[in-house]
Amino acid sequence: MQTWQLPEHIADVLPTNARQLESAREQLLALFRVHGYELVQPPLMEYAHSLLTHIDAGLSLKTILVTDRLSGRQLGIRADITPQVARIDAHLLSANQGINRLCYAGPVLHAQPDGLLNMREPLQAGAEMYGFADIRGDIELIDLMLKSMKIADMGKVLLSLGHIGIFRALSDAAHLDAGQSATLLALMQDKDTGTVEAQVKAWKLDGMWAKAFSLLPRLYGGREVLSDARGRLPDLSAVGGALDELQAVCDAFPDCEIHIDLSELRVDNYHTGLLYAAYAADFHDAVARGGRYDGLGGYFGRARPATGFSFDLRSFIGRLPTSERQPAVLVDAEDAEAAREAVEALREQGQCVVIDYGIGHNVSEELAGRLKKTDGVWQVVKR
């Protein structure tokens, strides 16, 4: 093996792309800040039992585990920042009984990539709201997610909506056990209505519930899906409430293209209600995902309503606006000491000043000039 090789699905970020990422990160955090979201920076590594909440079984497959040489205990390298933020809200910020608005932007590490085209070291950015159960909180986060996509230069974005509460309500009413519910959830993802129908028939479910489960994979499309669902799904209060929430989101974004899929249920995840995602042209999967995950903080001692979204900023590199490097001022190496005061003054003003040792450099070809002493004063002389 060559010493310069990196593991599969791991890559360096070179200067041009690094400038793009850092510029976008700064703009995103500024956007979050003016909406009231405070930055938190959880550690890259924690005790494994804190990272693996046992709510999301899929997370354990993504998490890289190591042994702590200090304590002998098992540590995990984070694969998702959301459980860490839930811990912070539940424990470190527990003095606030009201709403906590929190945001983050940092690397995570996956034991396996999410797909053949995905990296194992995403730069996960996101925003989360704790302590507010009303649909208005979800609408606020969706609005922030869509604004984030504008910063990432995603162009026209399609907003996809779902609601796991509908499936849960039907499962409870049909008295499905945990194993049956998990099986049906997995089948729903493939939209194989034939297999779903065969499965509910094998379980000998009551006809009303069997029909409802078979119908869910067919309930997808535009805003009209909601009225269709109201007329065809069983009249359960939880189902009606979920449809009301979806309608409220649709009404809040009248100019946004919306796709509704009532069988988009995200297997092996911690979401409990409304689900939302953003899709953009030329991306094979959602560019951002979010939803409600009430009670996640209960694992850390304080169950609270919660909603939020996140995305991998590194996956946007090909679409991020170009961040040009500032033209540099050169100063000859033999003049550097004598010009030190002038050099530092320029740098304090934000000007890039590079010492020219005469053997080439990696600064922009478009130079701002060269620092020369003219009439006893150090000045930038244009080329």
Curated annotation (Swiss-Prot):
Family assignment from sequence similarity: Belongs to the class-II aminoacyl-tRNA synthetase family. HisZ subfamily.
Gene Ontology process terms (BP): histidyl-tRNA aminoacylation; L-histidine biosynthetic process
Protein keywords: Amino-acid biosynthesis, Cytoplasm, Histidine biosynthesis
Involved pathway(s): Amino-acid biosynthesis; L-histidine biosynthesis; L-histidine from 5-phospho-alpha-D-ribose 1-diphosphate: step 1/9
Known function: Required for the first step of histidine biosynthesis. May allow the feedback regulation of ATP phosphoribosyltransferase activity by histidine.
Compartments (UniProt record): Cytoplasm
Protein name as annotated: ATP phosphoribosyltransferase regulatory subunit
TM stretches of this protein: none
Source organism of this protein record: Neisseria meningitidis serogroup C / serotype 2a (strain ATCC 700532 / DSM 15464 / FAM18)
Pfam families: tRNA-synt_His (PF13393)
Quaternary state and interactors: Heteromultimer composed of HisG and HisZ subunits.
Highest taxon of the lineage: Bacteria
Record-level GO cellular component terms: cytoplasm
Miscellaneous section: This function is generally fulfilled by the C-terminal part of HisG, which is missing in some bacteria such as this one.
Gene: hisZ
GO molecular function: histidine-tRNA ligase activity
